[in-house]
């Protein structure tokens, strides 16, 4: 301090009072204040000297060192209020994020489901996967694993937008159902009534009718991506033989169980004979190696079509593969024709009509996939090449199949859609107990029709079920007491170039108490999207739904 005081005094003496720099004094003068002169500096020196004297006097009073400074009183200091749990600046749904109150009941289910998804992701080598789960209409978990864009290391998150592929069929069904409810569409008259551009058809010389109802459930006979009728028929014959063999084995096991599990040489010989005969028939009827959808050229179309009517030229002149109504053949092209029917029945362009539906359902991130527009949070899509290396999928244009597989969405929007369908399905059951309930987007009788399995159909992603109207449906069943119980659920999967998806709805098994004290929707909805093609996700979604259903049953 002596040195500081001496320096100040010396500077004042040599510079004529400009000890603090002329710049500062000039600034002081510009503010209209008195100039800083030697008197001001002298006053400063006097003050510093007095302070130093007091300090020295205090130090000379005792020989013992001064005690350490006391810690500040925490009561005297201003305290910052702690952040509440929901205000913590952590990524939503990360393992470190404090769970919102309505999700804490499902901590076990979330941990278990996250582990399951990690295992599925690792098994198939998927770059990224996003999941969303709602319970009784409330979203309780959504999370992204891996990368939406591998090259730029962009992680998946709940807002990630991906191709939903054939879940688009379920969206199109809502448009058809709304037109049917309004009396603008008859499901059972020939499609030429609405779309005369589609030619009348014959099968084996007989004139046949293709209707909207048959198109919805894939019973029209219109082809899928495979153009070779012979290959398709061989494949169907082989599948039928395989299914018959499985049914025979199941019947034999059932008969054995009813007899107390006892077997005999006669039964064993008969079983061996059946297996041998079926194996011989299988060798004779087994088709040559069938290309899967991703080996079909039409899946990779790059041509842009202006509307659904123009898209019909891809298949409208092809022969039917079988008589309408007689067999099931999954067909995305059938939904291209349905889009044209929606246009003619509604008076709107198909995409405009669908955007109105998305707006009503609050599905604000669901759009048709186009390459030119900037779509925020859109993922990139991947496949493994012949060398088992991860590569980007080629450019495709989905304008020829908006209705059957051309939309983009998020897990959150798919949950909203699933809950809207579940609400409409259940609201009629609750009406007597609660007259204040709003109507569903679709009427209860409409949803019952949509979720009722149709005869002669197949549900390829779960052999226990049947195809209904743009949904696969598994019905409730239990064969033996204290044994496996099959839950009723509806779902649709999707497979596109570089993408896989599933939307699954598991309705609650309602009792009288629930009908009197609860409101719809009641049940679990699961949506999963993935930026890797050929990933089967239905069984994973069902396992996740059942995990959340377990935790849900424990809520008081």
UniProtKB/Swiss-Prot annotation:
Residues 249-290 are annotated as: Disordered. GO terms for cellular component: mitochondrion. The modification N6-succinyllysine is found at residues 290-291. Its EC number is 3.4.-.-. One of its GO terms (molecular function) is peptidase activity. GO terms for biological process: lipid metabolic process; proteolysis; regulation of lipid metabolic process. Residues 1-117 form a transit peptide. Keywords: Acetylation, Hydrolase, Lipid metabolism, Mitochondrion, Protease, Transit peptide. It is found in: Mitochondrion. Residues 249-282 have a biased composition (Basic and acidic residues). The modification N6-acetyllysine is found at residues 304, 349. Its main location: mitochondrion. It comes from the Eukaryota. The keyword Cytoplasm does not apply. The active site is at 166 (acyl-ester intermediate). Mitochondrial serine protease that acts as a regulator of mitochondrial lipid metabolism. Acts by decreasing protein levels of PISD, a mitochondrial enzyme that converts phosphatidylserine (PtdSer) to phosphatidylethanolamine (PtdEtn), thereby affecting mitochondrial lipid metabolism. It is unclear whether it acts directly by mediating proteolysis of PISD or by mediating proteolysis of another lipid metabolism protein. Belongs to the peptidase S12 family. PANTHER family: SERINE BETA-LACTAMASE-LIKE PROTEIN LACTB, MITOCHONDRIAL (PTHR46520:SF1). This is Serine beta-lactamase-like protein LACTB, mitochondrial. It comes from Bos taurus (Bovine).
């Amino acid at each position: 301090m002596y040195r500081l005081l001496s320096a100040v005094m010396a500077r004042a003496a040599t510079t004529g009072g400009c000890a603090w720099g002329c710049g500062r004094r000039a600034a002081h003068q510009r503010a209209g204040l008195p100039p800083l002169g030697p008197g001001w500096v002298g006053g400063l020196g006097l003050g510093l000297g007095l302070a130093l004297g007091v300090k020295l006097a205090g130090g000379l009073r005792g020989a013992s060192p001064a005690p350490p400074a006391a810690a500040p009183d925490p009561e005297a200091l201003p305290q910052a209020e702690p952040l509440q749990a929901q205000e913590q600046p952590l990524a939503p749904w990360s393992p470190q994020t404090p769970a919102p109150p309505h999700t804490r009941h499902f901590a076990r289910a979330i941990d278990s489901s996250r582990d399951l998804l990690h295992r599925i992701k690792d098994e198939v080598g998927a770059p990224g996967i996003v999941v969303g789960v709602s319970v009784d209409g409330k979203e309780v978990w959504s999370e992204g694993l891996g990368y939406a864009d591998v090259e730029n290391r962009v992680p998946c998150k709940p807002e990630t937008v991906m191709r939903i592929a054939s879940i688009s069929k379920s969206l199109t069904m809502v448009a058809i159902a709304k037109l049917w409810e309004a009396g603008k569409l008859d499901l059972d008259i020939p499609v030429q009534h609405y779309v005369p551009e589609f030619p009348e058809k014959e099968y084996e010389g007989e004139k046949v009718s293709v209707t909207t109802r048959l198109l919805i459930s894939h019973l029209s006979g219109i082809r899928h991506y495979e153009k070779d009728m012979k290959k398709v028929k061989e494949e169907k014959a082989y599948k039928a033989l395989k299914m018959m063999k499985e049914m025979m084995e199941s019947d034999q096991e059932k008969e054995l169980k009813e007899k107390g599990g006892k077997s005999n040489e006669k039964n064993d010989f008969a079983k061996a004979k059946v297996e041998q005969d079926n194996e011989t028939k299988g060798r004779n009827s087994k088709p040559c190696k069938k290309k899967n959808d991703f080996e079909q050229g039409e899946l990779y179309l790059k041509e842009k079509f202006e509307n659904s009517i123009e898209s019909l030229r891809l298949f409208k002149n092809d022969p039917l593969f079988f008589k309408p109504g007689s067999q099931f053949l999954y067909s995305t092209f059938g939904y291209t024709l349905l889009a044209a029917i929606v246009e003619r029945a509604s008076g709107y362009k198909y995409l405009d009509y669908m955007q109105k539906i998305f707006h009503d359902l609050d599905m604000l991130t669901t759009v048709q996939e186009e390459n030119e527009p900037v779509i925020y949070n859109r993922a990139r899509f991947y496949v493994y090449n012949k060398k088992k290396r991860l590569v980007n999928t080629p450019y495709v244009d989905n304008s020829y199949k908006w209705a059957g597989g051309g939309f983009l969405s998020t897990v959150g929007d798919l949950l909203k859609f699933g809950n809207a369908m579940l609400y409409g399905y259940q609201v009629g059951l609750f009406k007597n107990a609660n007259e204040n309930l709003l109507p569903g987007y679709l009427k209860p009788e409409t949803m019952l029709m949509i979720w009722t399995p149709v005869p002669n159909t197949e549900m390829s992603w779960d052999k226990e079920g049947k195809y209904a109207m743009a949904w696969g449906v598994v019905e409730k069943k239990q064969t033996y007491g204290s044994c496996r119980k099959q839950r009723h659920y509806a779902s649709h999967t999707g497979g596109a170039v570089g993408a896989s998806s599933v939307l699954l709805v598991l309705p609650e098994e309602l009792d009288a108490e629930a009908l009197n004290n609860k409101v719809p929707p009641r049940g679990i909805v699961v949506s999963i999207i993935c930026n890797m093609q050929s990933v089967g996700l239905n069984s994973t979604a069902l396992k996740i739904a059942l995990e959340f259903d377990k935790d849900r049953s424990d809520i008081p």
